[in-house]
Amino acid sequence: MVKLNSNPSEKGAKPPSVEDGFQTVPLITPLEVNHLQLPAPEKVIVKTRTEYQPEQKNKGKFRVPKIAEFTVTILVSLALAFLACIVFLVVYKAFTYDHSCPEGFVYKHKRCIPASLDAYYSSQDPSSRSRFYTVISHYSVAKQSTARAIGPWLSAAAVIHEPKPPKTQGH
């Protein structure tokens, strides 16, 4: 153990006392200022940034970027184009997803069609396809006009049995 409050310069002056049980060993040797710091130089050279740049012979001409910069730019633009295509594909599939139709209807040509109409026109000849689409368009027009003609405050029978005024030809 080391005895506290002992002076390291008096190391050899006193013999270690046996009765204390401590040894007087200096923990830190004294430091001299001359050893801590190198002498300051008389001339200091400060290197600036312009010393490291090569002389530019073509100051007025356009400097062509490196090929590596073009490669990175092309890769980034291709990645963005790919991601844009993926987003458009997902949005397209979301809008054209096969919708479910009520019971008794079949989904054809982006519409829910009654299964009986589909079975009737699919069993006929191929030229009946045009008639099939005509029936479907009339069906949807009739459905729209019926929904507009009948208000919630009128009964359906009153609207159907009302006499219509005769149409006059002319202006």
UniProtKB/Swiss-Prot annotation:
Native species: Bos taurus
Entry similarity comment: Belongs to the NSG family.
Residue intervals annotated with topology Lumenal: 93-171
Protein name stated in the entry: Neuronal vesicle trafficking-associated protein 2
Primary gene name: NSG2
Stretches assigned to the Cytoplasmic side: 1-71
Bilayer-crossing regions: 72-92
Domain of life: Eukaryota
GO cellular component, one term: multivesicular body membrane
Compartmental location: Membrane; Golgi apparatus, trans-Golgi network membrane; Cell projection, Dendrite; Endosome membrane
